[in-house]
Amino acid sequence: MTSGPLTTNNLNDFHVRGWVKLRAFSTEDAVAMEQVLWQRLEKYGVLREDRSTWVNIHAAGLSQRARQHRLFREAITAELRQAVDQLLGEGWRRPKDWGSLLFSFPEVDPRPWDVATSMFHWHMDPLQNIDRVRSLICFSFLSQVLPEGGGTLLVEGSHHVVSKYFAELTPELHAQKSKVKRLRFYQYHPWLKELTTGKDLDNRSDRFMADPTDVFGYPLRVVELTGEPGEVFITNASAVHATSRNCADRPRFMRVLGLHRDPDLADGALTNKSLRETT
């Protein structure tokens, strides 16, 4: 296995939970990228100094134009590159830039923050990592994202259950449309069904985030991705994740990036078995 910044404990966390957190770029670069976004948002009437303009607009082309900026293409740490080497092998495909933009402004909705309900909020990229880690999704922070501040929700441990589900599908079920297979997955276990059907609970946060629940022998729990400018969560692409509401007092600025093992190269990615053997 390639050496790098991820320790045995880090690799164990990635195997068990489906994520590991480190630094994607410097705090200074993150602050500079956030400033670029504010400058671009001014063209849509959104002003940093005027909270009354902080509305969740459909800013067509904003992400694409911002990603052409030098910082968005070049600002990355050796730590992140080396960590991806450890997880995917050195033959992963380098992207042209380091991710699409995710942004949301504080809501005026009086409802308290809670875990997303509808199954259409929850999604995953299941087929890449059934036998080994071939794809990652990286969620990085341009601004500070606090709890209940719009950070992505992730079901830690769910990549194991996703792999189990797809490995058990018959050829006939595999041939079904992706939407059908996804709907069947959310009926695969009572906990998943409860998470994604909007069943009324006094506090969904307590139910799904406080303590792990055993699902087919794997501890599953919803975690909220929060962090400081420049930090990144590297996640298994098969882990179930969802959007969440921003009930904080500040905007959320993040980037999301999929990284993939080059299928034309010899497969040097970590198998699920080799990840277990590092622990």
Predicted features and spans:
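Extracellular structured ligand-interaction cores
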Residues: 17-19, 133-139, 149, 222-224, ...
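A generic fold-level signal
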Residues: 14, 96, 133-134, 147, ...
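Short, conserved beta-strand element in jelly-roll/cupin
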Residues: 123, 127-147, 226-229, 258-261
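A short secondary-structure junction signal
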Residues: 113-115, 120, 148-157, 163-168, ...
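Non-heme Fe(II)/2-oxoglutarate
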Residues: 46-49, 164-170, 178-185, 189-197, ...
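Short, solvent-exposed loop/turn segments at secondary-structure junctions
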Residues: 26-28, 103, 144-147, 159-160, ...
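A structural signal for short, well-ordered beta-strand segments and their strand-loop junctions
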Residues: 21-24, 93-98, 137, 151-154, ...
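Non-heme Fe(II)-dependent double-stranded beta-helix
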Residues: 2-16, 22-129, 270
